[in-house]
């Protein structure tokens, strides 16, 4: 199983919508840049029928160096999380054949 790349997304836009290759690539880049900028400005990104990107603050916590076993602090940080929407979950479950 492979991974979908931005180049493949641009190629699909080229094939399906008739955009030229440069326009298709720019559209994909602009889409992801909008998501990045929203997250940089502490905004939630809601993509209807797909899911939400959120920022979450993680507190400092104790960790351990796996080589030495020494306890070291893991610093507080902000992370991006993705929560899939119900429609996306349903499609993935139906495709995977694991729908309850």
From Swiss-Prot:
Domain of life, source organism: Bacteria
A single BP term in Gene Ontology: regulation of DNA-templated transcription
Molecular-function GO terms, alphabetical: DNA binding; structural constituent of chromatin
PROSITE patterns, alphabetized: HISTONE_LIKE (PS00045)
Gene3D superfamilies: IHF-like DNA-binding proteins
Gene Ontology CC, one term: cytosol
Start and end residues of each stretch annotated as Disordered: 53-72
Pfam families in the cross-refs: Bac_DNA_binding
SMART domains: BHL (SM00411)
Keywords linked to the UniProt accession: DNA recombination, DNA-binding, Transcription, Transcription regulation, Translation regulation
Self-association state and partner proteins as the record states: Heterodimer of an alpha and a beta chain.
Function noted in UniProt: This protein is one of the two subunits of integration host factor, a specific DNA-binding protein that functions in genetic recombination as well as in transcriptional and translational control.
Record-stated family: Belongs to the bacterial histone-like protein family.
Database matches in PANTHER family: DNA-BINDING PROTEIN HU, INTEGRATION HOST FACTOR SUBUNIT ALPHA
NCBIfam families attached to this UniProt entry: himA (TIGR00987), PRK00285.1 (NF001401)
Protein name as catalogued: Integration host factor subunit alpha
